[in-house]
Amino acid sequence: MNGVLLRHQQPGGLGRAPRKPMPRGASRLVAKEPLSVRLPKADFSFLKYLAWPLLLAVLGYGAYRGAEYILPYADRPIAKVSVEGDLSYISQRAVQQRISPYLAASFFTIDLAGMRGQLEQMPWIAHAEVRRVWPDQVVIRLDEQLPIARWGDEALLNNQGQAFTPKELANYEHLPRLHGPQRAQQQVMQQYQLLSQLLRPLGFSIARLEMSDRGGWALTTAQGVEIQIGRDHVVDKIRRFVSIYDKALKDQISNIARIDLRYPNGLAVAWREPVTPATVATASAVQ
């Protein structure tokens, strides 16, 4: 009897890979993350930088549209012009003629700067202020020039030494006449005011004051006395003259034609008429 070889076959048949043994003991299940956690979050922090500009833009647009609506009702024609200030040399009518071209505009569109410029071009106006007063008024404040002296034959000087030229210049021949280089108007006015103050206690007023191109000073009093001062120590020389005048010249003033202060320690006197012996003695005392 032929022998037969029997082989033990694993269940599952031929050609199958052996199964891995199952792990023994307990196993842990890992829960899956929610979709909202796994997806990247949107960053909206940039919106806070846009909030204020956006708000301002909205407010600005609202104000603009509101103004467009209100302006036709608020922007009225100019109904009244008031002029303030003490006016001695210019008239209300002259002011009205100057500003009349501007009054056709409305309350908000009137050119205040242009109106002020036109007013300050008038020779007698030193300074002008123009402002609106709700709802339909313009108020003008004017400061007139204060003429102190004549500047040669061509202009007047105010108290700041600023020249101005009114049409009626011939009406001010009574004012003292100042002369000097054009660049020295303010300096000459300051010197005039100072010397006038020093001479006033003697009863003298200045009719003419001149500054030469080299800086020398000379004046003529209203009494007709010429005083040569020179360039240096002007105030000291005038004070010396005041002191000597009270002591030796007061009684002879009507006979004095010219006084020369261009000496370091004295003065020289030129007389109108031939001097008497007493006058000669006086003149010798002050030289």
Swiss-Prot record:
Keywords: Cell cycle, Cell division, Cell inner membrane, Cell membrane, Membrane, Transmembrane, Transmembrane helix. GO terms for cellular component: cell division site; FtsQBL complex; plasma membrane. It comes from Pseudomonas aeruginosa (strain ATCC 15692 / DSM 22644 / CIP 104116 / JCM 14847 / LMG 12228 / 1C / PRS 101 / PAO1). Residues 65-287 are periplasmic. Belongs to the FtsQ/DivIB family. FtsQ subfamily. Essential cell division protein. May link together the upstream cell division proteins, which are predominantly cytoplasmic, with the downstream cell division proteins, which are predominantly periplasmic. May control correct divisome assembly. InterPro entries: Cell_div_FtsQ/DivIB_C, FtsQ, FtsQ_C_sf, POTRA, POTRA_FtsQ_type. Residues 76-145 form the POTRA domain. The chain crosses the membrane at residues 46-64. This is Cell division protein FtsQ. Part of a complex composed of FtsB, FtsL and FtsQ. The keyword Cell inner membrane applies. GO terms for biological process: division septum assembly; FtsZ-dependent cytokinesis. The keyword Zinc does not apply. It is found in: Cell inner membrane.
